[in-house]
Amino acid sequence: MPTINQLIANPREVQKSRKKVPALQQSPQKRGVCTRVYTTTPKKPNSALRKVAKVRLTNGFEVIGYIPGEGHNLQEHSVVMIRGGRVKDLPGVRYHILRGVLDTQGVKNRKQRRSKYGAKRPK
């Protein structure tokens, strides 16, 4: 337990909370360019080939973004929009790529939750 004089000389430091999405820098979304598009496997007990992309953002950060939905048209040099939101079974993936924005096409034949996947209303 410090003395009063010690506290006057060296006040207590407030612990800063760790940011969950530091690369966004307080923005809701950020734009970036895909540097690598690949698949990766999730942690136990799940099994799949999850589609992810390494993205270089406009602010210089390089992050890994998850590509949601079935099928995608992304390749290297595609311009994408990224939002926060981690994927629980993929370590290091703390961002989602937005579908139907910039170079990313929406999911085909999507009937429900279309706005999440950038799909137009079916006729």
From Swiss-Prot:
A single GO CC term, please?
Answer: small ribosomal subunit
**Which UniProt keywords are present, listed alphabetically?**
Methylation, Ribonucleoprotein, Ribosomal protein, RNA-binding, rRNA-binding, tRNA-binding
| Positions where 3-methylthioaspartic acid occurs in the chain | 89
Matches recorded under Pfam families: Ribosom_S12_S23
State a single Gene Ontology molecular function: rRNA binding
Location of region: Disordered: 9-32
Question: Biological process GO terms, please?
Answer: translation
Is Cell cycle among the key words of this record?
no
Supply the HAMAP family for this chain: Ribosomal_uS12_B
Which proteins does it associate with, and in what oligomeric form?
Part of the 30S ribosomal subunit. Contacts proteins S8 and S17. May interact with IF1 in the 30S initiation complex.
Q: Which PANTHER family match?
A: 30S RIBOSOMAL PROTEIN S12 FAMILY MEMBER
**UniProt record similarity statement:** Belongs to the universal ribosomal protein uS12 family.
**What is the documented function of this protein?**
With S4 and S5 plays an important role in translational accuracy. Interacts with and stabilizes bases of the 16S rRNA that are involved in tRNA selection in the A site and with the mRNA backbone. Located at the interface of the 30S and 50S subunits, it traverses the body of the 30S subunit contacting proteins on the other side and probably holding the rRNA structure together. The combined cluster of proteins S8, S12 and S17 appears to hold together the shoulder and platform of the 30S subunit.
| This protein's name | Small ribosomal subunit protein uS12
Organism whose genome encodes this protein: Bradyrhizobium sp. (strain ORS 278)
